[in-house]
Amino acid sequence: MEAGGERFLRQRQVLLLFVFLGGSLAGSESRRYSVAEEKEKGFLIANLAKDLGLRVEELAARGAQVVSKGNKQHFQLSHQTGDLLLNEKLDREELCGPTEPCILHFQILLQNPLQFVTNELRIIDVNDHSPVFFENEMHLKILESTLPGTVIPLGNAEDLDVGRNSLQNYTITPNSHFHVLTRSRRDGRKYPELVLDKALDPEEQPELSLTLTALDGGSPPRSGTAQINIQVLDINDNAPEFAQPLYEVAVLENTPVNSVIVTVSASDLDTGSFGTISYAFFHASEEIRKTFQLNPITGDMQLVKYLNFEAINSYEVDIEAKDGGGLSGKSTVIVQVVDVNDNPPELTLSSVNSPIPENSGETVLAVFSVSDLDSGDNGRVMCSIENNLPFFLKPSVENFYTLVSEGALDRETRSEYNITITITDLGTPRLKTKYNITVLVSDVNDNAPAFTQISYTLFVRENNSPALHIGSVSATDRDSGTNAQVTYSLLPPQDPHLPLSSLVSINADNGHLFALRSLDYEALQAFEFRVGATDRGSPALSSEALVRVLVLDANDNSPFVLYPLQNGSAPCTELVPRAAEPGYLVTKVVAVDGDSGQNAWLSYQLLKATEPGLFGVWAHNGEVRTARLLSERDAAKHRLVVLVKDNGEPPRSATATLHVLLVDGFSQPYLPLPEAAPAQAQADLLTVYLVVALASVSSLFLFSVLLFVAVRLCRRSRAASVGRCSVPEGPFPGQMVDVSGTGTLSQSYQYEVCLTGGSGTNEFKFLKPIIPNFVAQGAERVSEANPSFRKSFEFS
């Protein structure tokens, strides 16, 4: 656990010591180049491609760039040639001042893979500055009593060049009284001193004028001159003397303006005006005069402006004390500027890699450098980012860092990161700087479209119009852009016999489903298929969902009368004995409806009758029965019209016409079971009742047929009016087949009637149905209960 914590801290917080680390951090020695100052923009420094051992194309492909400290770019890199060029004219004096050698550090940043190459450019000084005196004229007062060999300080000149091009020596115009010496300060700057060679005589020559020349070591040399005006004075025995020849003082850089930082003091043993002392800067530079102020009476040295350790960390100020007689003394004040933590750390961003693909692994997102102009602990810097981000900081060469992702990101969870890099120094108080980097995560097609439902159920009423919008499917994709654009399609059906392409279509853009043709519930009640949703990513991802289409029934089929047949042939006459009791079953109207549900619920009613009140129709099963006792007064022929109506909205109907013939002496037939019946006596009573009921209805019908045949054979006078009863064979119309199994019972019948005088037996046989699909439910139950039951009855 502790090891993990240490590793985390290494990733999250890095301490940077602002020291020159050298080329070892880069893994190789620094490459060194040189160029003379004042070269024009575009000057060729070196061919980096050759020095790095890379082809020009490879240099460009790796995104090579030059990174310098600060925001000013002194160099440019040509990706066409691989040349390192100057981006501007370089002024060595502006960049480095008196520092020698003048070195500019820069890095070559290469990516894919990330690589730093540390480089140095030395700027060679050219002799482009002449020595310049701070004062063009110097006024000296020298006592006539001054002894030969006396050294008199003079104001120095300044040359901004360095090395041999800097100021080298001083000369004066030849004369018999003076010569000049060239001295060097501790910092290497040279200053002149005037040496008296011969005593002066004011009566002989009260004033002298000399030319002081400062020469540098350039080729050709440059020079600067100043005029020295010397006035020979009468005797002033004592010159002012400072209490200290050298004052050293340390001053904080944030010391307030007008603060007294040091007080110099000098004394003069003379009296009167010769003993009165005034203080002044001795040939001070413009920078010193802008920074300090000297009280001429008290010797207090004050600040005129704030000090800046990062710009100048020390000053050497020469002070002159002069009495009223013109004699002077000299002292030097060394001001050491003490660094204060007054500069916050700075961050310079070199490159940002954004956006990055969400599936990328450990990836460099940004390269940046940090710096602090302060020194010591004030210049030590810590870098950190928030702990809850999937990134870490990785130190690179010198003061460079890389911001690296820990692994693959998820754009669908978070598509943008605002990363705050905090850099803090170790000064007191600590100063910090925050820098925000926005990293965008680009989408990768890693999410398949997802339907809002696993399956969809759509309801369509039959007889719809073609191109009817029957419903929609919808899928969404968590990706973005083209990776989230979904295209819908119909997948091949699992049932090869389903003509899906002629039934429905789908809009590829929005998932709307359309019926291509009118659907028929009686032909197709339901079907299912699968739809696919595919995105436009590469590679494309897809998903699928199940769609069930349920066709709703419409009342588009009228009832169809199976019996009695209504095909325009000779009507079938039902025979009823006049002795029949009320409720006697005359016949049964059998009808079917091709619809389903309540659209197929049929009801029956007697619409017309020759003699109202004699017959009635049961509303639910179509049975026609006698309503009262028959009498001799009732007509022999009756015509009944039965209305068959379904329960749809609006209802549909059909009519059946029945012909009933009342006959005399025709009694209720008795139909005993055949001899094989005792073997079935053990059957369930309920089954027997069902069989007997079915046999009774069939026997009544067969009996009527036999009677009709007998009358025809006897050629009675009433045969013409009765006619022959025949039931045509053959199947009923195919459109009435109940494909759902939920419609009205549909059954065709065929009867064979055998009635002969000498046969010795009377049999009524149920023959096999012409259309096997129409099987009466009641008959199925009888067949299942006793499949060996013989469908034959005998008249007694």
Swiss-Prot record:
Pfam families assigned to the protein according to its UniProt record, in alphabetical order: Cadherin (PF00028), Cadherin_2 (PF08266), Cadherin_C_2 (PF16492)
Chain positions carrying an annotated carbohydrate: 169, 418, 436, 567
UniProt entry tagged with the keyword DNA-binding: no
Coiled coil: none
Membrane topology designation: Single-pass type I membrane protein
Subcellular location: Cell membrane
Cytoplasmic compartment residues: 712-796
Name of the protein: Protocadherin beta-3
Organism: Homo sapiens (Human)
Lineage: Eukaryota, Metazoa, Chordata, Craniata, Vertebrata
